[in-house]
Amino acid sequence: TVHLRTNPALLAFFKENPTVILDGELFVRGKTLQQLSGAARMEKNAYDCDWLQYWVYDCYNSADIDMIASERYKFLEDKFAEAHNFPIYRSGEDESEAPIRLLGHEYVSGWDNMKKLHDEWVSAGFEGAVITDPSKPYKVGSRCNNLIKIKQYKSEDFKVIGYKLGLRGSEDMTFTCELEDGRTFEAMPVGNREIKAEYVENFETKYKGHKAECTFFNYSDDGIPTQPKLRIFRFDLE
């Protein structure tokens, strides 16, 4: 990522705004998470990762910790994008080839409108949507309802052929699920301790060999479900 960290315009921005931390991620539309994370870990050959882009969507200013989201985005538009000639990507526009850009925000209210934008962005090659309360300050190192991620997960049924206990036994167990071609993947079941303990206790007689519904974000380059969760066994399909 040398081409990003040594970008002259980015260095100039930080020199002018030493108390600001940019919040963004490495992303290239059309590339899978597996491809992006693999390129980001490269150290020996910078040319193999010089296609990575840095998308900025928020910032934190230690000199003004009460700056609300709408003010932070206006700051990024004026002091980051306009002042240093970083492009702003807005939905529906042609995408710039610039390695660093600001992701455009859209004001929206109501779940139906949020879902509409989410679906539009996913169909355009993005992962989902992030909803931010424009009247709230940036929260560092904590989860809060100021920022909510929306991701539409896929759902399919897979045969369960085994299980693995975790470091805490059944509490962080995973089920071994089988794909149509015989390959397997691990999926963590949804449920409390009692449910998971029951899964282990009765696996051989009740669950082994049966279909279960798994939700997952997408398929990896190798055709394996990513971020899989086993939601429920589908005895009704048998």
Label the predicted regions.
Residues 42-46, 59-62, 81-238:
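Nucleic-acid 5′ end/cap handling module spanning
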Residues 1-94, 238:
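Covalent nucleotidyltransferase
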